[in-house]
From Swiss-Prot:
Protein's UniProt name: 2' cyclic ADP-D-ribose synthase BtTIR
EC number: 3.2.2.-
One MF term in the entry's GO annotations: hydrolase activity
List of catalytic residues: 230
Function: NAD(+) hydrolase (NADase) that cleaves NAD(+) into nicotinamide and 2' cyclic ADP-D-ribose (2'cADPR).
One Pfam family hit: TIR_2
SMART domains in alphabetical order: TIR (SM00255)
Class of the enzyme per the UniProt entry, highest EC level: hydrolase
Impact when changing residue 226 to A: 50% 2'cADPR produced, production of ADPR rises
InterPro entries reported in the protein's UniProt record: TIR_dom, Toll_tir_struct_dom_sf
Amino acid sequence: MNSSYYQNQINRLEKDIADLQKKIADENKKEIDKNKQIDSVHRTINKNTSISTLNSKQRQIDGYQKDILNCRTKIASYQKSIATKSAELGKKRQELLKAQQSEQKKLQDDQLKFQKKLQSEIEIQKRHLETLIAQNYSTQNNKLVSTEDIPEPTKQYDFFISHASEDKDDIVRDLAEALRNNGFEVWYDEFELKIGDSLRKKIDYGLSNANYGIVIISPSFVKKNWTEYELNGMVAREMNGHKVILPIWHKITKDEVLRFSPSLADKLALNTSIHTIDDIVENLKNL
């Protein structure tokens, strides 16, 4: 059973106990009221009270005492039910704790597996990038590379924007234009890609020649293969000791980022839910 199952049972038991405690309080109030009624009857009896009236009042008192006994019987029954449910509540809380510990261990195991998988992919991408850089350097020296493989002249970028295409209209296009309007060189696919270009080569070139990589992390981003390719390339550069990745969260929660990449969730990020494009640009100016 998962923790939600036990939590629901605990909530039900706690409600049952609270209802029983209220019933006990109601019966205690009834008992107090009946004792007051008995006292009231006693105060009406004096030496002039006739035998018939006295007998009538005694029957009245007997009725109140019977009601009091009934209240006490109910209270005892409610208290017994509370004791039973409290014992059951204690067991359910222990079961909840065990379920939570089991779920936490599973989450940690899943995160560890993901980190190992990510580390393996990063190593592969790192070797791939190193090979590309070495090939580009070698072909440049031997003048054997075409203008399609390495743009001429070589261009340096302040920022490479990694994003999912679904986020272009929401945030990415406006951010890219705002950065360019503030004098930054920006690698953004709508600025750089032309018909017939090799997407992989252009991305590799942008990643290799950008000072920073802005990563727009969104629900769409974490599902894309190309964005993961770009992110792995940036992580490979960071492993050489350079701060590269600048995360911006867009319509995504910390738990979602944590499931995608625990190491990425640990980075200080800007968030479009609280930062405007102008705020983001100002923060990037301070790098």
